[in-house]
């Protein structure tokens, strides 16, 4: 019997927990959100853009950025990450699609894990020689090959100088003088005439100079993107200051002569003839009691124009 008494309150508590949660009409069918405009964007928001900005840019789902990845059972609005508005968890996924969305024209970020410490980059070439032991144990000295004897070149400068001193002028006399006094240039003289190469510093490294290292940390941190954004903001700020500092000229007062100079006498135009059949006829049916009611209805129609646009006449919003 005591067990039957204790089971009564538990059954009542279980029935209370199983009762459905009642929701209001605004929770079940939330009103449509007003599209984003340029006036809603503040500095530091995720949807802040540089350059020429129009209201139509914030109504395009391909350009507008989402607030961020939505957690399980929670949905967020797409206005800005700094002012996230939470929606009822039971309605998650019915009003706004959460999740990251790639910006138009910008590739998705990808990353790969690097290999371990023992990994060697590049190709491994097996040496064909003895390697380090052979290099330490012996030293290959380049043996100079014997030079083959070659004919020495004539020293025409010295032969011409001697012919002039001897008083020989004609070509025949010069030819005979060269046959008798054949002066040749020795290898020692040729080596002395050549300019010796400049002395090299002892710590000089031979080979191709390596290019500067790639700034990987700046690339990974998007440093160049941040510098570009800062330059664009500084340029726009300077343009705004220049517009504010422009001198506004005073009001120009017109005189009687300037008004007479601009005055154009009106030309009376004859009205065109219209057929009686095409003359404007007043409306036969008036569904509005007064003109104020008509203007009020037209104003309401203009306000609902943004909601009735789109493919399905359900409005263009910032969320798909």
Swiss-Prot record:
Keyword Transmembrane helix set for record: no
Primary location group: cytoplasm
Tissue specificity as recorded in UniProt: Expressed in airway epithelial cells.
Source domain of life: Eukaryota
Cellular component GO terms held in the UniProt record: axonemal B tubule inner sheath; axonemal microtubule; sperm flagellum
Comp. bias regions, Polar residues: 17-27
Region (Disordered): 1-27
InterPro entries, A to Z: CFAP77
Entry keyword annotation includes Cytoplasm: yes
Subcellular location, record wording: Cytoplasm, Cytoskeleton, Cilium axoneme; Cytoplasm, Cytoskeleton, Flagellum axoneme
Entry's Gene Ontology BP terms: flagellated sperm motility
Alphabetical UniProt keywords: Cell projection, Cilium, Cytoplasm, Cytoskeleton, Flagellum
Subunit structure of this chain's protein: Microtubule inner protein component of sperm flagellar doublet microtubules.
Role: Microtubule inner protein (MIP) part of the dynein-decorated doublet microtubules (DMTs) in cilia axoneme, which is required for motile cilia beating.
Family statement: Belongs to the CFAP77 family.
Protein name: Cilia- and flagella-associated protein 77
Species: Homo sapiens (Human)
Organism classification: Eukaryota, Metazoa, Chordata, Craniata, Vertebrata
Name of the encoding gene: CFAP77
């Amino acid at each position: 019997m005591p067990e039957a008494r204790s089971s009564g309150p538990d059954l009542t508590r279980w029935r209370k927990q199983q009762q459905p949660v009642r929701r209001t009409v605004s929770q079940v069918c939330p009103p449509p959100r007003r599209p984003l405009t340029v006036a809603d964007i503040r500095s530091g928001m995720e949807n802040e853009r540089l350059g020429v900005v129009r209201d139509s840019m914030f109504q395009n789902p391909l350009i507008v950025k989402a607030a961020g990845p939505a957690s399980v059972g929670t949905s967020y609005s797409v206005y800005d990450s700094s002012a996230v508005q939470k929606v009822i968890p039971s309605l998650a996924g019915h009003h706004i699609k959460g999740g990251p969305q790639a910006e138009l024209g910008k590739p998705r970020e990808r990353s790969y894990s690097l290999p371990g410490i023992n990994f060697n980059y590049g190709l491994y070439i097996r040496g064909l020689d003895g390697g380090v032991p052979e290099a330490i144990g012996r030293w290959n000295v380049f043996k100079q090959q014997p030079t083959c004897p070659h004919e020495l070149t004539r020293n025409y400068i010295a032969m011409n100088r001697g012919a002039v001193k001897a008083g020989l002028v004609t070509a025949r006399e010069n030819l005979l003088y060269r046959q008798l006094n054949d002066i040749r240039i020795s290898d020692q003289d040729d080596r002395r005439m050549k300019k010796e190469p400049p002395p090299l510093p002892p710590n000089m490294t031979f080979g191709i100079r390596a290019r500067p290292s790639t700034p990987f940390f700046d690339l990974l941190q998007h440093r160049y993107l941040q510098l570009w954004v800062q330059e664009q903001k500084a340029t726009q700020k300077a343009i705004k200051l220049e517009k504010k500092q422009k001198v506004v000229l005073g009001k120009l007062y017109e005189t009687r002569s300037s008004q007479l100079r601009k005055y154009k006498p009106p030309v009376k135009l004859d009205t065109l003839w219209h057929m009686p059949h095409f003359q404007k006829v007043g409306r036969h049916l008036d569904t509005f009691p007064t003109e104020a009611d008509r203007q009020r209805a037209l104003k309401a129609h203009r306000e609902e124009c943004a909601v009735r646009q789109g493919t399905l006449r359900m409005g263009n919003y910032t969320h798909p």
